Amino acid sequence: MSVRLVLTKGREKSLLRRHPWVFSGAVARMEGKASLGETIDIVDHQGKWLARGAYSPASQIRARVWTFDKDETIDIAFFTRRLQQAQQWRDWLAKRDGLDSYRLIAGESDGMPGVTIDRFANFLVLQLLSAGAEYQRAALISALQTLYPECAIYDRSDVAVRKKEGMELTQGTVTGELPPALLPIEEHGMKLFVDIQGGHKTGYYLDQRDSRLATRQYVKDKRVLNCFSYTGGFAVSALMGGCSQVVSVDTSQEALDVAKQNVELNKLDLSKAEFVRDDVFKLLRKYRDQGEKFDVIVMDPPKFVENKSQLMGACRGYKDINMLAIQLLNPGGILLTFSCSGLMTTDLFQKLVADAAVDAGRDVQFIEQFRQAADHPVIATYPEGLYLKGFACRVM
């Protein structure tokens, strides 16, 4: 008999709506003992079966649902089916957009909670972010090897969130060859170097692909400021769009060096690209005090908020940085501003940008809205999957 997690009366409603999380406060008791990440059955207070998920005794999210099908077991065949379902959509996207790299598995939205898999050319980069995902590591890797024999698999589970569930950070080659220091990939007609071993996240921000493409329409003959530039995806896109100059700002010299190489890789005019190692907040104030002006500003900061207790401070940060950007824009200029913080709702982010415009003494029109690229889908029963939001704003 399998271990059962019994819910408190009335706490089954979210599972009946097929939300994939069970929080600790919803648990009445455990029947049997389960190890970290082990698959358990989830039942209501009367013993009615609801779902099958992974158990994490120390996490606020006490269980993450693998399946709502009582007849489905969590094994190699399960992961093979999930991967095949996900691949069908990515095949269509890759053909439509000319991609050789994409997010293959987007966690809960692809029915694999705690699992992130990005494909960069013939490398699969794996992140196992939950105890259940780690527990199923062998089955998942076996399914990947069967479906993708041409691909090497590299583990980037070196993410601090693993510590919250009592797991160590891991990184290294799983199967196949070691990724090169810089791997070239393609998106929307441009080539970009990706650092799988040492780069942010899995090596690159695939979720901003469509936003990078959208940037091109705003930059013809314009002076562009690219804040938090990382390895220069927005800068390359701006140059491909015909900008007169793009200034990329980041605190990492290594990232800026790769950004320069990305400009050269695409045979673009390097004289139109400037790379500045500096703190964005400080530099924006310096530019403001010096009277610098730009026609387009890309504001793509890292996550400012990890938990609800940080939300107030994050709001101040987002408002301040957007206020500074608005002050630096010429009349009619375009601000492309983003938030990747899941706790920051789209409505709240829009309000913060509007408040920033008031503080800057400028009128702003919202002219376009952005979200994560389509290889980062959001399943209807898990709205938390929508984490990236952005706006194109015309500053009067």
Swiss-Prot record:
Keywords: Cytoplasm, Methyltransferase, RNA-binding, rRNA processing, S-adenosyl-L-methionine, Transferase
Enzyme class: transferase
A GO CC term assigned to this protein in UniProt: cytoplasm
Main location: cytoplasm
Record's catalysed reaction(s): cytidine(1962) in 23S rRNA + S-adenosyl-L-methionine = 5-methylcytidine(1962) in 23S rRNA + S-adenosyl-L-homocysteine + H(+)
Alphabetized InterPro entries for the sequence: PUA, PUA-like_sf, PUA_sf, RLMI, RlmI-like_PUA, SAM-dep_methyl-trfase, SAM-dependent_MTases_sf
SUPFAM superfamilies referenced in this protein's UniProt entry, alphabetically: PUA domain-like, S-adenosyl-L-methionine-dependent methyltransferases
The family this protein is said to belong to: Belongs to the methyltransferase superfamily. RlmI family.
Summary of the function given for this chain in its UniProt record: Specifically methylates the cytosine at position 1962 (m5C1962) of 23S rRNA.
Protein name (database record): Ribosomal RNA large subunit methyltransferase I
The organism's taxonomic lineage, starting at the top: Bacteria, Pseudomonadati, Pseudomonadota, Gammaproteobacteria, Enterobacterales
